[in-house]
Every structure is written in C-alpha cells, then in structure tokens.
C-alpha cells in the first residue's frame, strides 16, 4: 500500500515537472491562443456581404450574389446554372 502511494506521488511530481518545463518553453502559446479565440468572436457580429449556397433568401431579391439564384420553392440559395 505504501509503495503504491509513493508511486502515485512520484507520478504527480513528474507530471508537475514536465508541465512546468513545457510551460516555461512556450510562454507565448496561451497569449496567442486567447488572441485567436477573441479574434474569431469579432467576426460573429459582422454581417456577411454576400449570400452563399444554402442561405435563406427572398425570391426576386437576390441582388447580393449574381452566381446564386433564390429558389422560389425552397426559399434558399442554389447554384445558378442558367436557362
């Protein structure tokens, strides 16, 4: 029982030492990760300038993207193939 406790304690100490060593080598990683996360959140509030395939639309008012057509049956954008 004592041996398993010492082994578990040694494992935790080893995990702590390895974690500390890797953290000291990559101090910029958490800052870069947080800046990327917050940069992605900035784009959520912006409206897309152009409707894409599968986006909902109003038939007859698809002036945003000429290469897509608004399906009057399904009310979503589909690829315009021409007539």
Curated annotation (Swiss-Prot):
Keyword match Disulfide bond: yes
One of its Pfam families is Toxin_12
Query: Coiled-coil annotation: which residues?
Result: none
Localization per Swiss-Prot or TrEMBL: Secreted
Leader sequence segment: 1-21
Query: What family is this?
Result: Belongs to the neurotoxin 10 (Hwtx-1) family. 15 (Hntx-3) subfamily.
- Notes on the domains: The presence of a 'disulfide through disulfide knot' structurally defines this protein as a knottin.
Protein name as catalogued: Mu-theraphotoxin-Hhn2g
Q: Which organism is it from?
A: Cyriopagopus hainanus
């Amino acid at each position: 029982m004592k041996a398993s406790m010492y082994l578990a304690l040694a494992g935790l100490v080893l995990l702590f030492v390895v974690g500390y060593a890797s953290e000291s080598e990559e101090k910029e990683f958490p800052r870069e990760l947080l800046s990327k996360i917050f940069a992605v959140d900035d784009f959520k509030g912006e409206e897309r300038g152009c409707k894409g395939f599968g986006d909902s639309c109003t038939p007859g008012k698809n002036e945003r993207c000429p290469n897509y057509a608004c399906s009057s049956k399904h009310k979503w954008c589909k690829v315009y193939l021409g007539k």
